């Protein structure tokens, strides 16, 4: 991010303050998942300022990130600013940020292989037979799944420990290790 652009956006912090807060969060909560949404192509954004944004993304290594091309909203200060950027340039900049994030995500996903994660079961995928689960870091309908194979049935709304065997850009794949809570349908069952 760039201090001039942050100021023009009427943000109350600067790059150094943001990096400081992010550093404190990571020191205090080592397994924290950091997510953000960015805007590329804000009015007046120069190539150098855009490079600052790209470098910020590379430095911070967000766990989840979305980047959108700036779009003028009617009756806003930004819509009346000089230096409106061509839509094609804005789209290309947003795409470049997402390409950087794709590389970061691939590394972060691959690093989870071999780890045990706690997941919440959302249900089963009828096509693959795998259980669709998510970690505490995953937003439903936004983030990927932890696709779980299990010798025992898993129940929606219940938590399980899963060994991550594989990953792709968005999803993790694993095997259920521990059945941590009984099914609400059968409180006497033993798994």
Q: How would you label these PLM feature ranges?
A:
Residues 69, 80-181:
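Terminal RNA-binding accessory module
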